[in-house]
Amino acid sequence: MSIHSPGYTVRRIPVNNVTDTTMFILTGFTDDADLQVLLFLLFFVIYLFTLIGNLGLVLLVIGDSRLHNPMYYFLSVLSFLDACYSTVVTPKMLVNFISNDKSISYPGCVTEMFLFVTFGTTECFLLAAMAYDRFVAIYNPLLYAVKMSPRVYIPLIIACYSGGIMHATIHTVATFSLSFCASNEIRHVFCDIPPLLAISCSNTNINQLLLFYCVGSIEIITILIVLVSYSFILFAILKMNSAEGRRKIFSTCGSHLTGVSIYHGTILFMYVRPSSNYALEHDMIVSTFYTIVIPMLNPIIYSLRNKDVKEAMKKIFERNFFMNKVHFKL
């Protein structure tokens, strides 16, 4: 059976159980062909800025010796995560905007969901690790080099990734152990957990509980680490006599708190609530925001208010300007 819409045809394949499901159809935001072209252009520009901003920040940290410390190593890992996070979802979504074929293969859907959950969860843990790093640097700066040596921050980063992989494995196995009946249409732009559960004909109570308690536990743990770390940072700031020192700390920590608040706020809205409150159309917009828009915003949030990053960027621009000027004269 087919669904005819302006500009393209979407195939709907009736399925009886999970073994018959060889593909899914991602219905996306709209059937309007003109609007899809506009959405393609919008998200293409966002994705381009995301890659330039995040990968540029990674190269900046690698290339500038002044940024060779744990704080900026964590920031470069966050930027790499954001680039990967967006890349898992955006290219396929862009293709769907301009293609008649909106399908994604069953293995492709499994892979997309696994990577999406892996990078998303890893980012939650990494934001908590970054808060702890700021706490150590500000509350006990004399011991910072010892307490955040490579033997500490490298295992921390590995632990963040390990936690992300474990969490993704749980949900991927649980979700794709279900049967998918009647329709293979996913009312979403990518293979997220709630819309997949919505088209399953199996009992999804265990999956709903897993989603609520796993995501809820991760959110509680990581947010508590952030809150405790910043409570100690606040005490340290109140003891400071230097106004310049306070401004520098507020500049560094304010950007991190902004990023944490936006990211965790959208995740809590998406996953930590009763399944009866899910509205797939609204959730599609919110999930698009935190998978595509937030990765674009993070380089801006973390660089515009950071003096060291701005100086490193200024140094590169000045060097490139000088090189171009010399080349022009020659």
From Swiss-Prot:
The chain crosses the membrane at residues 38-58, 67-87, 112-132, 146-166, 209-229, 250-270, 284-304. Keywords: Cell membrane, Disulfide bond, G-protein coupled receptor, Glycoprotein, Membrane, Olfaction, Receptor, Sensory transduction, Transducer, Transmembrane, Transmembrane helix. Gene3D superfamilies: Rhodopsin 7-helix transmembrane proteins. Pfam families: 7tm_4. One of its GO terms (biological process) is sensory perception of smell. Disulfide bonds join C109-C201. It is a multi-pass membrane protein. GO terms for molecular function: G protein-coupled receptor activity; olfactory receptor activity. One of its GO terms (cellular component) is membrane. Signal peptide: none annotated. It comes from the Eukaryota. Residues 1-37, 88-111, 167-208, 271-283 are extracellular. It is found in: Cell membrane. Residues 59-66, 133-145, 230-249, 305-330 are cytoplasmic. Glycans are attached at N17. Belongs to the G-protein coupled receptor 1 family. Potential odorant receptor. This is Olfactory receptor 5T9. It comes from Mus musculus. The gene is Or5t9.
